[in-house]
Amino acid sequence: DIKIRLGCAMPLVTTETAEIRGRDLNTGLPKVMQISSEQVRQAIEEPILQIIDVIKMALEKTPPELSSDVMERGIVLTGGGALIRNLDKLISQKTGIPVYVTESPLNAVVRGAGKSLEDLEKLKSVLSSSRKLK
């Protein structure tokens, strides 16, 4: 919740804050404190940079015929991480490729899996299984 509410991949023009409640790890007692969007950004910065490195590695291994499609159509972000503000802009900046956040990113994977199940025959060539698809 905090990651989505305050998280950002790039510094914001105006820092935002929120009150969080939890347990103090030193005393074990309940504690309330303020946390800023900049603190959250710094906390998630390293994992985000690792994700970008993996994206770059995948792009380097992409066959040329697919690379042109990616350059033309861009990268589409799905899932909860896609809700982190400016993640699309940072990935685009680091890769030089347009990046878009899909409509309803939290449901996109489920919708895509559902569409795949509707026509398994078309996907036989790219699916792997320990059993033969009938």
Where do the model's predicted regions map?
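Conserved phosphate-binding/catalytic loops in two-lobed NTP-binding clefts
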Residues: K89-K115, L123, S130
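Phosphate/ATP-binding catalytic cores across multiple sugar-kinase/actin-like superfamilies
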Residues: A43-V70, S116-D119
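Residue-level signature of catalytic and energy-coupling elements of molecular machines
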Residues: I2, I55, L77, A113
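Active-site lining segments that contact anionic ligands and/or coordinate catalytic metals
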Residues: T15, P30, E72-R73, G96
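Phosphate-binding glycine-rich/basic clefts of nucleotide- and phosphate-handling proteins
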Residues: D1-E45
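Tubulin/FtsZ superfamily GTPase core signature
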Residues: Q39, K56-L59, V99, E103-S104
